[in-house]
Amino acid sequence: CCGSTHAYVDAAKILRDRYGNLVESNDGRKVRMGLPHLLTVQCGFDYEPGTILNGQMSMRYCVTAGFRYGNALPNEFTPDKLSDAKNVAFAQAIEIEHDPDLDNIYPANFCGWVEVETGVGTNQYDREYLLNASGSCHNPDKEKAMAAKFHSLLEDIVPQEQRAKVENCVLNIENSAADELIKKFHL
């Protein structure tokens, strides 16, 4: 998905841990996002099912994927998921507002916030604000986030033992000679 959506997807995943799968539960809680002006134009358009690229560029769909699937990786952008009635309804119901405070931060930081109504009709919100996404160079836990994404992307393709070898090589690349790495990559 578009790099500008990553902090929003991370925020949705955090809120999902607190409130559950809001797409499946469909309990009527409002979900809102604050975007810098540039992102309201780039990714804040109304969601309509379409191409994979359309889904990847849609802030609303990417956040929906974060709430429903806990990720916004290639498996979340299949034609079936992009046009799934629950996904479409949830994405279309997300409210987007321009947050001028974010204009001064983005794009130096890929920031953003998502909030969930704490109870249906309460008009009270629980906001998750992130200055940067989990994979950002500004995140002190970047390596952990990148390794988790690597494993998630390849879990159905490469056996866990081989993924662990690759991860170890990459995380220790500064301490390894090139010929050692080549030998290790002969999985």
Regions found by a protein language model. Give the residues of each.
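Terminal-appendage/accessory-domain detector
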Residues: C1-L187
